[in-house]
Amino acid sequence: QSIPNSAPLEYIKNLFDNYAFQFDAHLQNILLYKTPELLREQLNPFLENKKYKLLDLGCGTGLSGQCFSDIAKKIIGMDISRNMLNKAKEKACYDILIEKDILSGIPELAENFDLVLCIDTLVYFGNLNDFFEKIIVCLQVNGLLAFSVELANEAATSYLLQTNGRYQHAETYIKELAEKKPLKLLRYASVIGRQQDNEAIQTGLFIFKKI
Protein backbone atom coordinates (compact mmCIF):
# COMPACT_ATOMS: atom_id res chain seq x y z
CA GLN A 1 0.00 0.00 0.00
CA SER A 2 1.43 3.34 -1.05
CA ILE A 3 1.98 6.18 1.41
CA PRO A 4 -0.25 9.26 0.90
CA ASN A 5 1.59 12.31 -0.45
CA SER A 6 0.39 14.46 2.45
CA ALA A 7 -2.01 14.60 5.37
CA PRO A 8 -5.60 15.63 4.49
CA LEU A 9 -5.99 19.41 4.69
CA GLU A 10 -9.17 19.18 6.76
CA TYR A 11 -7.36 17.01 9.29
CA ILE A 12 -4.53 19.56 9.64
CA LYS A 13 -6.94 22.48 9.92
CA ASN A 14 -9.09 20.81 12.59
CA LEU A 15 -6.06 19.57 14.52
CA PHE A 16 -4.56 23.03 14.88
CA ASP A 17 -7.82 24.93 15.28
CA ASN A 18 -8.37 22.81 18.39
CA TYR A 19 -4.72 22.88 19.48
CA ALA A 20 -4.20 26.64 19.13
CA PHE A 21 -5.27 27.70 22.60
CA GLN A 22 -2.73 25.57 24.48
CA PHE A 23 -0.20 25.30 21.64
CA ASP A 24 2.59 27.59 22.89
CA ALA A 25 2.53 26.32 26.47
CA HIS A 26 2.43 22.67 25.39
CA LEU A 27 5.27 23.03 22.89
CA GLN A 28 7.57 25.03 25.10
CA ASN A 29 6.86 23.50 28.52
CA ILE A 30 5.99 19.87 27.72
CA LEU A 31 7.62 19.14 24.36
CA LEU A 32 10.59 21.45 25.06
CA TYR A 33 10.25 22.75 21.51
CA LYS A 34 13.18 24.85 20.33
CA THR A 35 13.38 24.31 16.56
CA PRO A 36 13.01 28.02 15.60
CA GLU A 37 15.91 28.98 17.85
CA LEU A 38 18.06 26.12 16.60
CA LEU A 39 17.35 26.99 12.98
CA ARG A 40 18.18 30.64 13.65
CA GLU A 41 21.55 29.58 15.08
CA GLN A 42 22.31 27.63 11.91
CA LEU A 43 21.15 30.48 9.69
CA ASN A 44 23.04 33.30 11.41
CA PRO A 45 26.40 32.77 9.60
CA PHE A 46 24.68 33.23 6.23
CA LEU A 47 22.70 36.36 7.04
CA GLU A 48 23.78 39.60 5.43
CA ASN A 49 23.75 42.97 7.15
CA LYS A 50 20.29 43.86 5.90
CA LYS A 51 16.61 43.43 6.64
CA TYR A 52 14.85 40.57 4.87
CA LYS A 53 11.48 40.22 3.24
CA LEU A 54 10.38 37.06 5.00
CA LEU A 55 7.74 34.44 4.26
CA ASP A 56 6.85 32.16 7.19
CA LEU A 57 5.04 29.07 5.88
CA GLY A 58 2.95 27.18 8.40
CA CYS A 59 3.57 30.04 10.81
CA GLY A 60 1.22 28.68 13.46
CA THR A 61 1.01 30.88 16.55
CA GLY A 62 4.03 32.92 15.49
CA LEU A 63 6.84 31.37 17.52
CA SER A 64 9.03 31.40 14.41
CA GLY A 65 8.06 34.96 13.54
CA GLN A 66 9.15 36.09 16.98
CA CYS A 67 12.50 34.38 16.55
CA PHE A 68 13.26 36.06 13.21
CA SER A 69 11.46 39.41 13.46
CA ASP A 70 14.65 41.32 14.28
CA ILE A 71 16.07 40.64 10.78
CA ALA A 72 12.85 41.30 8.87
CA LYS A 73 11.63 44.44 7.16
CA LYS A 74 8.39 42.62 6.34
CA ILE A 75 6.97 39.27 7.46
CA ILE A 76 4.10 37.44 5.81
CA GLY A 77 2.77 34.44 7.70
CA MET A 78 0.67 31.70 6.13
CA ASP A 79 -1.23 28.95 7.91
CA ILE A 80 -4.29 26.79 7.30
CA SER A 81 -5.66 27.28 10.83
CA ARG A 82 -7.58 30.46 11.64
CA ASN A 83 -7.23 29.94 15.38
CA MET A 84 -3.47 29.61 15.08
CA LEU A 85 -3.34 32.80 13.02
CA ASN A 86 -5.36 34.64 15.67
CA LYS A 87 -2.69 33.68 18.20
CA ALA A 88 0.04 34.82 15.78
CA LYS A 89 -1.71 38.17 15.39
CA GLU A 90 -1.47 38.71 19.15
CA LYS A 91 2.33 38.53 18.91
CA ALA A 92 2.31 41.59 16.61
CA CYS A 93 5.35 40.57 14.57
CA TYR A 94 3.61 39.89 11.23
CA ASP A 95 2.71 42.48 8.63
CA ILE A 96 0.26 40.18 6.84
CA LEU A 97 -1.32 36.87 7.87
CA ILE A 98 -2.88 34.61 5.24
CA GLU A 99 -5.29 31.77 6.01
CA LYS A 100 -4.34 29.23 3.37
CA ASP A 101 -2.66 25.87 3.00
CA ILE A 102 0.87 26.50 1.81
CA LEU A 103 0.83 24.61 -1.50
CA SER A 104 -2.17 26.50 -2.84
CA GLY A 105 -1.24 29.75 -1.09
CA ILE A 106 2.31 30.19 -2.38
CA PRO A 107 1.32 30.62 -6.07
CA GLU A 108 -1.17 33.34 -5.09
CA LEU A 109 1.50 35.55 -3.53
CA ALA A 110 2.12 38.69 -5.53
CA GLU A 111 5.73 39.17 -4.44
CA ASN A 112 9.04 37.39 -4.03
CA PHE A 113 11.03 36.89 -0.84
CA ASP A 114 14.69 36.74 0.12
CA LEU A 115 14.06 34.51 3.15
CA VAL A 116 11.50 31.70 3.36
CA LEU A 117 10.96 29.73 6.57
CA CYS A 118 9.05 26.48 6.94
CA ILE A 119 9.46 25.21 10.48
CA ASP A 120 7.76 22.05 11.77
CA THR A 121 5.31 22.15 8.86
CA LEU A 122 6.71 19.69 6.34
CA VAL A 123 5.95 16.92 8.83
CA TYR A 124 2.45 16.98 7.30
CA PHE A 125 3.76 16.43 3.77
CA GLY A 126 5.41 13.28 2.49
CA ASN A 127 6.29 14.00 -1.12
CA LEU A 128 8.07 17.37 -1.12
CA ASN A 129 8.50 17.84 -4.86
CA ASP A 130 5.53 20.25 -5.13
CA PHE A 131 6.86 22.21 -2.18
CA PHE A 132 10.24 22.74 -3.84
CA GLU A 133 8.62 23.58 -7.20
CA LYS A 134 6.50 26.31 -5.65
CA ILE A 135 9.24 27.69 -3.38
CA ILE A 136 11.56 28.25 -6.34
CA VAL A 137 9.03 30.60 -7.92
CA CYS A 138 8.56 32.85 -4.87
CA LEU A 139 12.23 32.91 -3.77
CA GLN A 140 14.51 35.62 -5.14
CA VAL A 141 17.87 34.70 -6.65
CA ASN A 142 20.36 34.48 -3.75
CA GLY A 143 17.37 34.18 -1.41
CA LEU A 144 17.52 31.75 1.51
CA LEU A 145 15.23 28.82 2.25
CA ALA A 146 15.38 27.44 5.80
CA PHE A 147 13.23 24.58 7.02
CA SER A 148 12.98 21.61 9.34
CA VAL A 149 11.86 18.00 8.97
CA GLU A 150 11.66 15.05 11.31
CA LEU A 151 14.42 12.67 10.28
CA ALA A 152 13.70 9.12 9.18
CA ASN A 153 16.02 6.28 10.13
CA GLU A 154 19.13 5.72 8.07
CA ALA A 155 17.56 2.83 6.16
CA ALA A 156 14.82 5.05 4.73
CA THR A 157 15.26 6.42 1.21
CA SER A 158 12.39 8.91 0.99
CA TYR A 159 9.66 9.47 3.59
CA LEU A 160 7.69 7.50 6.18
CA LEU A 161 4.23 8.11 7.64
CA GLN A 162 4.20 7.61 11.40
CA THR A 163 1.25 6.42 13.47
CA ASN A 164 0.86 9.96 14.88
CA GLY A 165 0.08 11.28 11.39
CA ARG A 166 3.41 13.06 10.96
CA TYR A 167 5.93 12.27 8.23
CA GLN A 168 9.63 11.62 8.62
CA HIS A 169 12.02 12.38 5.76
CA ALA A 170 15.37 10.93 4.83
CA GLU A 171 18.26 13.39 4.68
CA THR A 172 19.28 11.97 1.29
CA TYR A 173 15.74 12.41 -0.08
CA ILE A 174 15.77 16.14 0.70
CA LYS A 175 19.23 16.65 -0.76
CA GLU A 176 18.44 14.71 -3.95
CA LEU A 177 15.22 16.69 -4.51
CA ALA A 178 17.03 19.98 -4.02
CA GLU A 179 19.84 19.01 -6.40
CA LYS A 180 17.29 18.99 -9.23
CA LYS A 181 16.37 22.62 -8.47
CA PRO A 182 18.42 25.83 -8.61
CA LEU A 183 19.30 25.42 -4.94
CA LYS A 184 22.66 25.21 -3.20
CA LEU A 185 22.87 23.55 0.21
CA LEU A 186 24.54 25.92 2.67
CA ARG A 187 24.00 24.02 5.89
CA TYR A 188 22.57 20.76 7.15
CA ALA A 189 22.36 19.88 10.83
CA SER A 190 20.75 17.09 12.82
CA VAL A 191 19.47 18.32 16.19
CA ILE A 192 16.99 17.47 18.92
CA GLY A 193 14.05 19.72 18.02
CA ARG A 194 11.65 18.61 20.76
CA GLN A 195 10.61 15.76 23.02
CA GLN A 196 7.68 13.38 22.48
CA ASP A 197 6.66 10.83 25.11
CA ASN A 198 10.10 11.19 26.74
CA GLU A 199 11.79 10.51 23.42
CA ALA A 200 14.12 12.98 21.69
CA ILE A 201 12.87 13.77 18.20
CA GLN A 202 15.69 13.94 15.65
CA THR A 203 15.14 17.00 13.51
CA GLY A 204 16.90 17.87 10.28
CA LEU A 205 17.62 21.55 9.66
CA PHE A 206 18.29 22.59 6.06
CA ILE A 207 19.42 25.93 4.67
CA PHE A 208 19.49 26.42 0.91
CA LYS A 209 20.35 29.37 -1.31
CA LYS A 210 18.67 29.95 -4.66
CA ILE A 211 21.27 30.20 -7.42
Locations of the language-model features?
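N-terminal auxiliary segments of SAM/dcSAM-dependent transferases
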Residues: 1-13
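Short alpha-helix
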Residues: 166-181, 188
